[in-house]
Amino acid sequence: MTTHRNDTLSTEASDFLLNCFVRSPSWQHWLSLPLSLLFLLAVGANTTLLMTIWLEASLHQPLYYLLSLLSLLDIVLCLTVIPKVLTIFWFDLRPISFPACFLQMYIMNCFLAMESCTFMVMAYDRYVAICHPLRYPSIITDHFVVKAAMFILTRNVLMTLPIPILSAQLRYCGRNVIENCICANMSVSRLSCDDVTINHLYQFAGGWTLLGSDLILIFLSYTFILRAVLRLKAEGAVAKALSTCGSHFMLILFFSTILLVFVLTHVAKKKVSPDVPVLLNVLHHVIPAALNPIIYGVRTQEIKQGMQRLLKKGC
């Protein structure tokens, strides 16, 4: 593995150079293997979960359709970000073309927003299941899932589209070294010799509007869920509901917290090492993806039974 660091324009003008850890280049050494393992775990586990849901007829239910959508989003996010990061860590292959960079930027923003929206819909599903169990079959239907999926797709595709468009219209005046492992909007626009105020305002306003509204609805859903669970008389039912919903909420909280810390470190970039938000940005694209199949899948009895039935059929 090489650690060659050359911040001159060593590529053609049509390329950016991804320069991951400017202050701490040794981080590449100890991150390369764990990140590779996390990537394999995330892609493998989500693919397994996705295939289980679609091959096992008993799992053809609204909640599991949403879970399969979450797995698909995780797979796309991992494949969009982590392979390029690993080629930098292992082989120091830092160039990325302008079109590839802006495409990666769009997919990252769009699919992270879709994942946040999917968490919100799944939280609503749990709210209806626990707070209005008798009405659940009439509210959470296949038709509801189709409408929810269309909303997730339309809202986030349209809202995140201006981000790469605004970045692609900037002039970069010969500067092409991105101090990041990925084509994050803030890192790319920092290279421009144009005024990037509109870019940054849209990034923050759009991000807080999408993720903020999702988080508020998620928090409200789990607040009502907690209140309903605490009213249950059966101790076993209370423990089971708290265990399931608690793990779901902790994962969503982790997903949101690491994103919030990433934003705050960008705001306070003079007080923290510039490598910290770079590291958080990379981890944010793989750790939740590795945890989602465990929290939402393996710990769910119906999915475990579905996997066992598929294994028996295969044998």
Curated annotation (Swiss-Prot):
Residues 1-29, 80-103, 165-200, 263-277 are extracellular. It holds the Pfam family 7tm_4. It comes from the Eukaryota. Disulfide bonds join 101-193. The chain crosses the membrane at residues 30-50, 59-79, 104-124, 144-164, 201-221, 242-262, 278-298. The keyword Cytoplasm does not apply. Residues 51-58, 125-143, 222-241, 299-315 are cytoplasmic. It is a multi-pass membrane protein. One of its GO terms (cellular component) is plasma membrane. InterPro entries: GPCR_Rhodpsn (IPR000276), GPCR_Rhodpsn_7TM (IPR017452), Olfact_rcpt (IPR000725), OR51/52/56-like (IPR050402). Glycans are attached at residues 6, 185. GO terms for molecular function: G protein-coupled receptor activity; olfactory receptor activity. The keyword Membrane applies. Its main location: membrane. It is found in: Cell membrane. Keywords: Cell membrane, Disulfide bond, G-protein coupled receptor, Glycoprotein, Membrane, Olfaction, Receptor, Sensory transduction, Transducer, Transmembrane, Transmembrane helix. Odorant receptor. Belongs to the G-protein coupled receptor 1 family. This is Olfactory receptor 56A3. It comes from Homo sapiens. The lineage of its organism: Eukaryota, Metazoa, Chordata, Craniata, Vertebrata. The gene is OR56A3.
